[in-house]
Design a protein with these regions (language model features):
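Structural signal for the C-terminal ends of transmembrane alpha-helices
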Residues: 80-89, 222-224, 278-286
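Membrane-interface helix/loop boundary segments of multi-pass membrane proteins
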Residues: 168-194, 221-228
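Functionally important transmembrane alpha-helices
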Residues: 200-261
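Interfacial transmembrane-helix boundary/kink motif in multi-pass membrane proteins
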Residues: 2-28, 61, 87-125, 260-271
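Juxtamembrane helix-loop-helix connectors linking adjacent transmembrane helices
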Residues: 48-55, 91-164
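C-terminal membrane module of polytopic membrane proteins
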Residues: 7, 237-290
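Alpha-helical transmembrane segments in multi-pass membrane proteins
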Residues: 30-85, 98-106, 130-131
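Hydrophobic alpha-helical transmembrane segments
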Residues: 59-74, 140-164, 264-273
């Protein structure tokens, strides 16, 4: 039986339901697989992992492993299966020129003061305590993950925190959602905004909602202008990889480059510099299309 494109003629609502079902089933199976591996091949109990006491490096690594497979199960596997079953074009292999890639990288390097300023503003909001529980748990996990002693820890973190999320989240949010919302509404800019909202909301970190939303807007326009997922994937990867790399003791002197603090003057110049780079990027891509 030929499965490729079997759901191609389904309605947009039906296809969305198929993707949601694939995501639920996939993340459950991947999480169960990760837990089974831990139980069978380590001395760590799932109770210890679920309590998140992080009393040893092995427990931290176990949580990283579960998070890695869960992320693959939530973002990568279902989106690729959906693309196969619905014959959906993810636009993953379209070419882009070197200048566009360099401009996208420069944007991510220069945008941090502006994002940091938004983060501080978001932190000033009066957020209910029940919401802050999610932020506290996320901060606890992140701080535990970023305690690295060896190059092996650094490379594992780059895989779990940078590479897999960059590929998986961009496949789902820009590769699928943004394209489909744009088709449904006929308004690509609205699609970018809605996708950025969903992108930020799924992380369940309310004190970081606005900066992640702003990042989602940038990633959305990188995809919209270039027509290739590789630009937002590389930009997303760079953003996460800098935070991981500068937390490693050898590179900790550069941690200020990713700090969540910035003056309004720094934010202003960051915004203006990024605006100029965005203009150059759009112009560069327009010339390429012509």
């Amino acid at each position: 039986m030929r499965l490729k494109g079997i759901f191609k003629e389904k309605s947009s609502t039906g296809k969305l339901g198929i993707l949601f079902l694939l995501m639920v089933v996939s993340v459950i199976l991947h999480t169960l697989l990760a837990q089974a591996v831990i139980v069978l091949f380590t001395d760590i109990t799932l109770i210890a992992v679920s309590m998140m006491q992080f009393t040893s490096q092995s427990e931290i690594d176990a949580v990283k492993f579960i998070q890695m497979l869960s992320a693959i199960g939530l973002f990568i596997t279902p989106t690729l299966l959906y693309a196969y079953l619905c014959d959906f074009d993810l636009k993953l292999i379209l070419n882009f020129n070197r200048q566009s890639l360099l401009l996208a990288i420069a944007i991510m390097l220069l945008i941090n003061p502006f994002i940091a300023f938004i983060y501080e503003w978001n932190m000033s909001f009066n957020i209910p305590d029940w919401m802050l529980v999610y932020d506290d748990n996320a901060e606890k996990i992140t701080n535990s993950f970023l305690k690295m002693n060896t190059l092996g820890d650094l490379f594992f973190n780059l895989l779990v925190i940078a590479i897999i999320p960059a590929i998986g989240e961009e496949l789902l949010f820009r590769g699928y959602l943004q394209q489909n919302i744009s088709q449904w509404t006929g308004k690509p800019h609205v699609a970018i905004i809605i996708t950025a909202i969903l992108f930020s909301a799924i992380h369940m970190q309310f004190q970081g909602f606005l900066p992640r939303f702003a990042l989602g807007i940038v990633l959305g326009y990188l995809f919209y202008w270039s027509g290739s997922l590789w630009l937002p994937i590389i930009a997303h990867l760079l953003n996460n990889a800098m935070a991981v790399t500068f937390s490693y003791p050898t590179f900790s002197d550069y941690a200020y480059l990713t700090e969540n603090t910035a003056t309004w003057q720094q934010a202003f110049f960051s915004f203006m510099a990024v605006g100029l780079l965005v203009f150059l990027l759009q112009k560069n891509l327009s010339i390429k299309k012509d």
